Amino acid sequence: GLTQKDLVALSGAHTIGKAR
């Protein structure tokens, strides 16, 4: 399931991908 931790991790990974 998606916990707040998972959402933060996904959000962070997405942001890093966009930055690159």
Swiss-Prot record:
What Enzyme Commission number(s) apply to this enzyme?
1.11.1.7
Superkingdom in the source lineage? Eukaryota
Residues reported to bind heme: 14
Any idea which UniProt keywords this protein has?
Answer: Calcium, Heme, Hydrogen peroxide, Iron, Metal-binding, Oxidoreductase, Peroxidase, Secreted
Q: From the Swiss-Prot or TrEMBL record, state where the protein is found.
A: Secreted
Bound cofactor: record note:
Binds 2 calcium ions per subunit. Binds 1 heme b (iron(II)-protoporphyrin IX) group per subunit.
Q: What InterPro entries does the entry give?
A: Haem_peroxidase, Haem_peroxidase_sf, Peroxidases_heam-ligand_BS
Chemical reaction(s) catalysed: 2 a phenolic donor + H2O2 = 2 a phenolic radical donor + 2 H2O
Query: Where does it primarily localize?
Result: secreted
What cofactors does this protein use?
Ca(2+); heme b
Task: Give GO MF terms, alphabetically.
Answer: heme binding; lactoperoxidase activity; metal ion binding
**What do the Gene Ontology cellular component annotations say?**
extracellular region
- Give one Pfam hit by family name: peroxidase
Where, in this chain's numbering, is Ca(2+) bound?
A: 15
> Which GO BP terms apply?
hydrogen peroxide catabolic process; response to oxidative stress
Class of the enzyme per the UniProt entry, highest EC level: oxidoreductase
Name the protein family: Belongs to the peroxidase family. Classical plant (class III) peroxidase subfamily.
According to its UniProt entry, the function of this protein is described as: Removal of H(2)O(2), oxidation of toxic reductants, biosynthesis and degradation of lignin, suberization, auxin catabolism, response to environmental stresses such as wounding, pathogen attack and oxidative stress. These functions might be dependent on each isozyme/isoform in each plant tissue.
The protein's name is: Peroxidase 1
